[in-house]
Swiss-Prot record:
Name of the featured protein: Biotin synthase
Pathway info: Cofactor biosynthesis; biotin biosynthesis; biotin from 7,8-diaminononanoate: step 2/2
UniProt entry keywords in alphabetical sequence: 2Fe-2S, 4Fe-4S, Biotin biosynthesis, Iron, Iron-sulfur, Metal-binding, S-adenosyl-L-methionine, Transferase
Cofactor requirements of the protein: [4Fe-4S] cluster; [2Fe-2S] cluster
Entry EC no(s): 2.8.1.6
Length: 5
């Protein structure tokens, strides 16, 4: 999973 905020 890619980092996302």
């Amino acid at each position: 999973m890619a980092h996302s905020s």
